[in-house]
Amino acid sequence: MWRPLRTTSSVGHLHLLPGEPYKPLTSQWLHPSTGEGGERSSRTLTMAERVSIALDVAEALDYLHNHGQVPIIHCDLKPSNVLLDHDMVARVGDFGLSRFVQGANSNSFQPIANTTGIKGTIGYIPPEYGMGGGVSVEGDVYSYGTLLLEMFTAKRPTDPLFQGGQSIRSYVAAAYPERVTAVADLSLLQHEERNLDEESLEESLVSVFRVALRCTEESPRARMLTRDAIRELAGVRDAYG
């Protein structure tokens, strides 16, 4: 069974900080051409910063799913619920839709009956939720993969580009792995061409998009485990020295 997470005071982890006044990972960072108030922002997240943020969020999810007294499903992971401090350390916040999973083994696929309607935000909700499937840790993983796709393409999953059956996932999958730079955030490419050789940047993007695509598989059982996502992204981070 599951029940609402009414307090997060007992959820202690470096990358879990609900309710704190930190800046969200929203348009100011991911879509600098449309910053707050409509002004154009010159601040672009570097490749290293994006990978570090992605790792922080993966570690937070892994803690929620696997290292508490009971698994916790966030149910609404999206950029505005990822909070950044002054050092660009990411913390996952807003547990308003989160659920404690009681009597579940987080190491197996055990969806929890969804009796109160779809949980989450359009664009980040896994397909099984829309078909009446129960909430699960795999659902959070799907939302995480979508977050990764947005972070490295600067495209929202609800972008008008994605019509007629196309999605942000199919957009990236069509370019993976040979043409990943064609779908990557242009501002990221322009910034990193001064810091990384083209081959190194492309290899890093391939690794990140591999994680994102594995996390957003249609079948929940096929999705990557958070610990595997952490391992692969840590390899990308370590490549920067």
What are these regions (language model features)?
Residues 56:
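Catalytic core of carbohydrate-active enzymes
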Residues 59-72:
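Protein kinase catalytic-loop region centered on the HRD/HxD motif
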Residues 76, 81:
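Conserved catalytic-loop position in the HRD/HxD motif
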Residues 1-52, 88, 92-241:
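Cytosolic eukaryotic protein kinase-like domains
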